[in-house]
């Protein structure tokens, strides 16, 4: 198979949602249909030890939440599928936002009873700004929920995107009968104990009149709704979908696996192939460019706690990866050999010999890489556009509970900070170690992982919220430190101030008008 044919097979997408909308459950079902797992583990099955495959950390298994992006790959219907299951919790939006830089499409999961929720709205705005196509799966049809027409209206009114249903529910909750699949010309009958059963349309494009469904009042109502939508609603346009202007909407129940395989088949038919990415010079690097290129969107420590390893996740943008190849690490200008490279099923992995544009590979990292790094070969020399960064809003002082375990404490901090979900600062005057995060849960996960993965108990002291501003090295003066600010350095050794509040920052500006305060560090 040629390189072009291989790249055309790739479908790389992220699943986004508000917490508890069923994102991890639908991920499990997709993996099951792809043959990657035999049985979908759900949050409900926690007592049996049958955990979600994509939730691989201990804390995820215990709490039933995803706190890190998982990468999973499988083949289905002639396509190579790369799924990135992202954290839904708002405290981990930084990891999610970076992950969205590595995909070509997004699947938005919505709880039929709750509609569009806060985190869904935030993530959709990121997807929209990037022009990523969005496919919507309205979940939990086996439970009582809101009217389907109201949910479609909400997509347009709250998210500002036109929608087109690809199927339509027949009843809901205890009256859920199935799905009217006008895309494929059939009815998918809901039989939770026996799986699904299809009723094909006749030559007139209708359910045969002899079938009992035609006398079912819920089916009659669904038929009327569907005909109204087909006549007066938006028409399906593949071009508008790929442009991110129209979202195809699918209904189903991930927990009972109903409607999920139909969704997968249709999604793979219309989801885009790998797309180009821009460099800092605005040059578009196409997937078919023969030179290899990719960028690191995530670093994860301890995917195998036995070996204290660290994996850098690379989205391949162009060309082909071959095991043992030398690449240029653009940030340093140095050559790096990619010899120990893996692909994933959550925490499970296997060595990979080849991968192409659109694939996600894991490179073992001994401290060489940073989130946002670009890897290239041949004539490609420029970095890709920078990944989004977030200024922390909450801060904690942290120290080792046992001073005799300072080495494991420092190793844990170094590795977990490198993942990018939590920021490290060191006081210029006292040497105190401070951590910054966008939400409280990040601190809880940090503390938990330090104990589990590095056997290092920590003492964490809240500092409240602070405002971070960087300064230039030549402006650094210890005398500028006061009771209203903390002079510190970040993990890259850049100088900065942690201001108590906006008033303290304005006071500083008035006293030192020539000092430039930067929201992000720039050279």
From Swiss-Prot:
**GO annotation, cellular component aspect:** cytosol
Claim: Metal-binding is one of the keywords in the record: no
Molecular-function GO terms, alphabetical = GTP binding; GTPase activity; translation release factor activity, codon nonspecific; translation release factor activity, codon specific
Compartment(s) where it occurs, according to its Swiss-Prot or TrEMBL record: Cytoplasm
Please name the GO terms of the biological process aspect recorded for this protein, alphabetically. Answer: regulation of translational termination
Q: Which UniProt keywords apply?
A: Cytoplasm, GTP-binding, Nucleotide-binding, Protein biosynthesis
Q: Which SUPFAM superfamilies match?
A: EF-G C-terminal domain-like (SSF54980), P-loop containing nucleoside triphosphate hydrolases (SSF52540), Translation proteins (SSF50447)
| Positions with a binding annotation for GTP | 17-24, 85-89, 139-142
Matching Pfam families, A to Z? EF-G_D2 (PF22042), GTP_EFTU (PF00009), RF3_C (PF16658)
Main location group = cytoplasm
Q: Does the keyword Cytoplasm apply?
A: yes
The residues covered by the tr-type G domain are 8-275
Which PANTHER family does the entry mention?
PEPTIDE CHAIN RELEASE FACTOR RF3
Please give the family membership noted in the entry. Answer: Belongs to the TRAFAC class translation factor GTPase superfamily. Classic translation factor GTPase family. PrfC subfamily.
NCBIfam families associated with the record:
prfC, PRK00741.1, small_GTP
Role according to the record: Increases the formation of ribosomal termination complexes and stimulates activities of RF-1 and RF-2. It binds guanine nucleotides and has strong preference for UGA stop codons. It may interact directly with the ribosome. The stimulation of RF-1 and RF-2 is significantly reduced by GTP and GDP, but not by GMP.
Q: Which HAMAP family match?
A: Rel_fac_3
**Protein name from the UniProt record:** Peptide chain release factor 3
Source organism: Lactococcus lactis subsp. cremoris (strain SK11)
